[in-house]
């Protein structure tokens, strides 16, 4: 029971619903892979204790025991091969160099494997999600940036071969985006996207700026895991469903039928609306999808508070100072401030494919490292 509590606590180092600044940002000193596996360090001590209780591991964690043994063998092989670097035979030294490179690569892979085995996944990692984007500080420039970020995530969903369905879309007069939401579904969609929530800041010269000055604008991303039917049951008696005429773009359909749907969850006051589709039935279905995600996210936050007495995760004021990532167009770079990682070629990054995926993978790895450090510190 104790181990379950410890492992559960480690999960919350990074919030399930990353809709604002991280509860505590990943420090620049978050341990890299080699630091975690330093001989004599807490992780090594932990692994040695685990390997020392083979009978227990054979029953409970056979896969972990196998990887620990393989890591020890590979490290022993590396040490033995390194001695050959001082051999008088040049051909033997070159052969040793090649063997060392291959061995180091295998050791790195084994260490990553151990981290994945030690850090438990969240129950929501396999869930689909609701993406919400909202323009923040910066007027029309913020709305233009919001539109670009929404497009970036739509392209990322295509890159990952996920399903992407727009639920809401409220454009601005000049081609920007005030607010939009979408349902994203696919293999480990929430696991990949959960660290995208927060305030995104852009620094660039707006198209309307005649003096060439760099402006700073912001927008907010919210990521909400979608519940399954088992996760959340809603009593129909707790809902008030209103219909109204749609407004905004839509041609002759606008203001002619009561297709827009507004659903209120009476016990909590949570509201969900949708007027994206021409069909009232379809809009009701989409509004319910959003409502379920919001209620499920509230439930998860309550669980966090019960376990850790943590403050609620909030979107915040969308101010310029609350940021998880900066997109600097004059310098052609994007920087994630939680892990102090900078990538160049911003144009490619905004296309939502391999560069964004690289940053997502880095965030996942650092989150796993911090969770592992928390687990080890409480178990050693």
UniProtKB/Swiss-Prot annotation:
GO molecular function, one term: translation release factor activity, codon specific
Organism: Homo sapiens (Human)
Record's function text: Mitochondrial peptide chain release factor that directs the termination of translation in response to the peptide chain termination codons UAA and UAG.
Membrane-crossing residue ranges in chain numbering: none
Homology family: Belongs to the prokaryotic/mitochondrial release factor family.
Cellular component GO terms, alphabetical: mitochondrial matrix; mitochondrion
Name of the protein this chain belongs to: Peptide chain release factor 1-like, mitochondrial
PTM characteristics: Methylation of glutamine in the GGQ triplet by HEMK1 is conserved from bacteria to mammals.
Upper classification of the organism: Eukaryota, Metazoa, Chordata, Craniata, Vertebrata
Predominant subcellular localization, coarse grouping: mitochondrion
Annotated gene: MTRF1L
Expression sites (tissue/organ): Expressed in skeletal muscle (at protein level).
Region listing for GGQ domain, in residue ranges: 236-300
Presequence boundaries: 1-26
Cellular localisation: Mitochondrion
């Amino acid at each position: 029971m104790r181990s379950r509590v410890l492992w559960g606590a480690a999960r919350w180092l990074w919030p399930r619903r990353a809709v604002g600044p991280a509860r505590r940002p990943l420090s620049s000193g978050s341990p890299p892979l080699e630091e975690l596996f330093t001989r004599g360090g807490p992780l090594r001590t932990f692994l040695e204790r685990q390997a020392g209780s083979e009978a227990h591991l054979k029953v409970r964690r056979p896969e972990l025991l196998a990887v620990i043994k393989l890591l020890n063998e590979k490290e022993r092989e590396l040490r033995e091969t390194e001695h050959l670097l001082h051999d008088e035979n040049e051909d033997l030294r070159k052969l040793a160099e090649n063997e060392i490179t291959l061995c180091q690569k295998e050791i790195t892979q084994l260490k990553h494997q151990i981290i994945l085995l030690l850090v438990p996944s969240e129950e929501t990692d396999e869930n689909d999600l609701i993406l919400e984007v909202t323009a923040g500080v910066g007027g029309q420039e913020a709305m233009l940036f919001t539109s670009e970020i929404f497009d970036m995530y739509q392209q990322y969903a295509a890159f990952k071969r996920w399903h992407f369905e727009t639920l809401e879309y409220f454009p601005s007069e000049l081609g920007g985006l005030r607010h939009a939401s979408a349902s994203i579904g696919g293999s480990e969609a929430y696991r990949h996207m959960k660290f995208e929530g927060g305030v995104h800041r852009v620094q660039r010269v707006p198209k309307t700026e005649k003096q060439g000055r760099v402006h700073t604008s912001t927008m907010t991303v919210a990521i909400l895991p979608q519940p399954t039917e088992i996760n959340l049951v809603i009593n129909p008696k707790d809902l008030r469903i209103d219909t109204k005429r749609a407004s905004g773009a839509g041609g002759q359909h606008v203001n002619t039928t009561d297709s827009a749907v507004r659903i209120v969850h009476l016990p909590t006051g949570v509201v969900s609306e949708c007027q994206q589709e021409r069909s009232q039935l379809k809009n009701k279905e989409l509004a319910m999808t959003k409502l379920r995600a919001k209620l499920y996210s509230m439930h998860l936050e309550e669980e966090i508070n019960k376990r850790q007495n943590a403050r609620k995760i909030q979107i915040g004021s969308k101010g310029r100072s609350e940021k998880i990532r900066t997109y600097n167009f004059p310098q052609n770079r994007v920087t994630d401030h939680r892990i102090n990682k900078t990538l160049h070629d911003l144009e490619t990054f905004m296309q939502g494919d391999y560069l964004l995926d690289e940053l997502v993978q880095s965030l996942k790895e650092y989150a796993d490292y911090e969770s592992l450090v928390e687990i080890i510190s409480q178990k050693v």
